[in-house]
């Protein structure tokens, strides 16, 4: 896996030179600049506190992959290598300097997103005509920042804000080709402090607003991906498959009758398989009997449900 949740942050586990540009797609959001302005922001830091990434490493947003003409699930596979309709990178490097880079131009005849090859910054050309300012981080001990992206018509602007609230780097450009902007929204982490064995960047406090940022609640997927069940000799056995969860999680199973929903079982989530297995005795019939699996992150106020 490329990603994990740690202390409320999304952490990229990969920093190797042959696994660059790891992406985590916000599949319930997309950009349509014809609808209005877009604002995105996220806090970024090296995944391992106290470490410093080189200027060849970067993190931030990948926007504009695909669009309404492409299935969003296909766009969500975009990572690693640039390709036609790949979109635009709005990123901050290990020195705290921001840049707008193209992710739609192939190099060396390669146009496959999931291959094992190195990608240099020269393979991700700077967007033409952009104006950049700022020297980035001034303190090697504090390599954290907030990255803000603003789109207004054809104008794209990004800035990195340091831990003391000061703007440490900016970039702005005019983008005449809407295909670079319209489409998917993703976070991207490429390389990191230690390309041999380290991790990439950590993201937290992701926010988005603006009439040009579209919301697609029907695209939400998880944390329960699917369920399988059997009923034999009045025993219900149901397995719920989760996405990657880590350790220390549990889920509940409810059945519904004429009186409403009733919890009938609980199960820990097995960290190796990311499955919760439920067993319920005394099941007379399961014909037209709704069930749901409930899950809540520790200390979370919102509960996720999967119904069948």
Regions found by a protein language model. Name each.
Residues 169-201:
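Flexible glycan-contacting loops in extracellular carbohydrate-active proteins
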Residues 245-308:
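Extended acidic/polar, glycine-enriched regions
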Residues 14-118:
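Secretory/extracellular carbohydrate-interaction modules
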Residues 1-14:
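Extracellular glycan-recognition surfaces and repeat-rich motifs
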Residues 40-42, 125-129, 135-173:
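Carbohydrate-binding surfaces in secreted/extracellular proteins
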Residues 35-37, 142-144, 235, 248, ...:
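Extracellular Ig-like/FN3 beta-sandwich strand-entry sites
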Residues 25-32, 131-138, 175, 226-227, ...:
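Beta-strand-rich interaction surfaces with strong enrichment in secreted/lumenal proteins
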Residues 183, 188, 200-247:
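Non-catalytic, glycine-rich low-complexity segments
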């Amino acid at each position: 896996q490329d990603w994990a949740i740690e202390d409320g942050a999304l952490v990229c586990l990969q920093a190797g030179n042959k696994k660059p540009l790891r992406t985590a797609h916000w599949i319930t959001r997309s950009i349509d600049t014809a609808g209005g302005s877009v604002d995105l922001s996220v806090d970024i830091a090296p995944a391992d506190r106290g470490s410093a990434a080189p200027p060849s490493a970067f993190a931030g947003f990948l926007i504009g992959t695909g669009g309404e003409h492409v299935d969003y699930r296909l766009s969500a596979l975009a990572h690693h290598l640039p390709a036609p309709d790949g979109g635009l990178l709005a990123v901050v490097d290990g020195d705290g300097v921001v840049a707008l880079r193209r992710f739609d131009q192939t190099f060396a005849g390669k146009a496959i997103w999931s291959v094992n090859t190195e990608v240099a910054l020269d393979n991700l050309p700077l967007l033409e005509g952009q104006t950049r300012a700022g020297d980035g981080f001034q303190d090697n001990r504090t390599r954290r920042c907030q990255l803000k992206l603003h789109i207004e018509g054809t104008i794209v602007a990004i800035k990195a804000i340091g831990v003391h609230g000061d703007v440490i780097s900016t970039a702005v450009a005019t983008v005449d080709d809407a295909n670079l902007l319209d489409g998917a929204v993703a976070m991207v982490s490429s390389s990191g402090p230690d390309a041999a064995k380290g991790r990439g960047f950590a993201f937290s406090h992701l926010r988005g607003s603006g009439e040009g940022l579209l919301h697609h609640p029907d695209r939400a997927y998880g944390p329960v991906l699917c369920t399988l069940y059997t009923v034999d000799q009045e025993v219900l056995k149901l397995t719920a498959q989760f996405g990657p969860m880590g350790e220390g999680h549990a889920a509940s199973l409810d059945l519904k009758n004429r009186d409403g929903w009733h919890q009938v079982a609980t199960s820990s989530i097995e960290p190796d398989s990311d499955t919760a297995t439920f067993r319920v005795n005394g099941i007379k019939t399961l014909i037209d009997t709704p069930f749901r699996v409930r899950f809540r992150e520790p200390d979370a106020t919102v509960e996720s449900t999967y119904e069948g």
